[in-house]
């Protein structure tokens, strides 16, 4: 496990140094995703993040409400870009804009009915997805429910076609 984490970290550092994302390509990608999956961040954020991670090797960024029980899944899953910004199915954001968004909500849409932000938002970087897989069984070992598998395959194909080969 330590070797796997070392390799993932080394690859991520190499990508950070060698590859800068073209933000216009990322905006084009998000436009396509939002048109095809308008509710991507209402339950499908982990599917988008896993597909993006599998194409780019970039780390996950888990958004956690520290007021909820520890065994609860993250309230949102994003990808950390080499420049420190975050990306999800809605677009490119900063940590500050994510915090502002969640604090502006009285109720967290798309999550548990009636759930409100209980505590402080925590950002947890997950380089290889091992933490994420503990929360989302359907993402463990690359397995999905049938509907998530179809969405995942389609989103993966879109990401590859827009960003090109890595």
Model-identified regions with their sequence ranges:
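Protein-protein interaction and targeting regions used for scaffolding, dimerization, and localization
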Residues: 1-18
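A structural boundary/capping signal
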Residues: 15-166
């Amino acid at each position: 496990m330590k070797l796997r984490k070392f390799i993932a970290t080394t690859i991520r550092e190499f990508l950070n140094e060698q590859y800068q994302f073209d933000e216009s390509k990322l905006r084009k990608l998000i436009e396509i995703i939002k048109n095809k999956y308008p509710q991507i961040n209402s339950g499908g954020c982990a599917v988008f993040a896993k597909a993006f991670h599998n194409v780019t090797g970039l780390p996950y960024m888990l958004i956690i409400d520290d007021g909820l029980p520890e065994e609860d899944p993250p309230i949102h899953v994003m990808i950390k870009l080499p420049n420190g910004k975050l990306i999800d199915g809605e677009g490119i954001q900063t940590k500050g804009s994510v915090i502002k968004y969640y604090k502006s909500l009285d109720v967290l849409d798309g999550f548990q009915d009636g759930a409100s932000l209980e505590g402080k938002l925590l950002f947890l970087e997950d380089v290889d997805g091992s933490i994420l897989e503990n929360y989302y069984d359907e993402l463990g070992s690359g397995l999905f429910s049938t509907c998530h598998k179809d969405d995942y395959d389609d989103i993966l194909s879109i990401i590859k076609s827009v960003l090109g080969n890595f």
